[in-house]
Amino acid sequence: MKNLLVAQSGGPTSAINATLAGVIENALSSPSVDKIYGSVNGIQGVLNENLIDLKTKITNVSELNLLCQTPASALGSCRVKLKDPAVCADEYETIISVLRKYSIDCFIYIGGNDSMDTVDKLSKYLSDKGITDITVVGAPKTIDNDLCGTDHCPGFGSAAKYIGTTFAELERDCHVYTTKAVTIVEVMGRDAGWLTAASCLARATGAKGPDFIYLCEVPFSIDTFLKDVKAKLEEQDAVIIAVSEGVKNKDGRYISEEVQSSAVDSFGHSYIAGAAKVLEDAVRNEIGCKVRSIELNLMQRCAAHLASATDIQESRMLGKAACQYALEGAGGMMAAVIRTSNKPYATEFKALPVCDIANAIKSVPADYINDAGNDVTEKMVDYLTPLIQGEMNTVYENGIPKYIYLY
């Protein structure tokens, strides 16, 4: 019999708990699994020995389904970066000690790029130490959709659905007046513009906007931006713009640097924000029309009420696949989504070496972006559309979606 540990890390999503549900579901149905532990607050919970017995928290299918519709990370999260073991191996030895104490054979870590870095480092350390009876497997999660190897990341489809819907609603609101006005919406995405690109989905509802989509893959010029806006204002009263939070100028500097914090997180990433605000000020100063900036911020990653059924179902199945890989001893691997067909849409799951995925960025391909660098092409629309299909049969309580708490 095997004991299994699962944890979540990084930024929450609307689908990360569906992946957790898939892990638990597979483990509960496996005759080879005895205990199922959850680490509270990711790898930090392992280091602090803050583990809970998930068999006492999830006891039936209804609770598994409820977990799938619960946003954010039900086990909590963390931003802990493991040190290079060649410099300091203390954390690794602590982790192994805790895993040994609870007789854990399989550890599944659900998270994004930095979490896959943890899976990679821990797997290599175990291998270097000749420890073969502990298997570490990664399960992808990130609304940024910037993990390599996988066609798309669990959580991205739901965030894309929310963003497309939000732009469709904003477009209708902005066009009710005849006053010249510009609305600039900042979308998450430090290193890749996938989320911002999802704003194009609003056009499927008949919306003309967003009028411009600026991704961080394209060097950004405020002068060119202002020319775009001025030209569009000559054609229509309202202009709606989507911009990635991580847009940079030709010198590689964030345009938002003048308003961003100098602080960085534990992985060395700058806390960036304010791109839309910088552009709002530029429009106000150079064009002089009515202008507002909107930052979607956390809403785009926790709007479970608008989750994509495709995303949630795939995320749950991916969790089951990751659990199976762990039980089969496929250490140092990540469960990936492989798109086998677009029309009709179909996917399968595959275990890929996490060493080829960790610390790499999947950028938006050049042929998904128009020549002017201010919009996306039909290839992007074709890529995105299947990921947002379907709606969840959400359970409500007193008029509000019902959620589950694990700790």
Regions found by a protein language model. Give the residues of each.
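Short, ordered loop/turn segments at secondary-structure junctions
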Residues: 9-11, 39-45, 79-80, 112-113, ...
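Gly-rich Lys/Arg/Thr-decorated short loops/hinges at beta-loop-alpha junctions or inter-strand turns
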Residues: 2-6, 67-81, 141-151, 178-181, ...
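N-terminal phosphate-binding or glycine-rich loops at protein starts, especially the Walker A/P-loop
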Residues: 1-51
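Short glycine-rich or small-residue beta-strand-to-loop segments that form or flank ligand, phosphate
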Residues: 3-13, 73-79, 105-111, 138, ...
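Glycine-rich oxoanion-binding loops at beta->alpha junctions
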Residues: 49-105, 114, 143, 154-156, ...
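Accessory alpha-helical/coil subdomains and C-terminal extensions
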Residues: 98, 106-111, 117-133, 153-292
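C-terminal non-catalytic interaction/assembly regions of soluble proteins
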Residues: 257-407
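Short glycine/serine/threonine-rich phosphate/pyrophosphate-binding segments
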Residues: 13-23, 46-47, 83, 91-93, ...
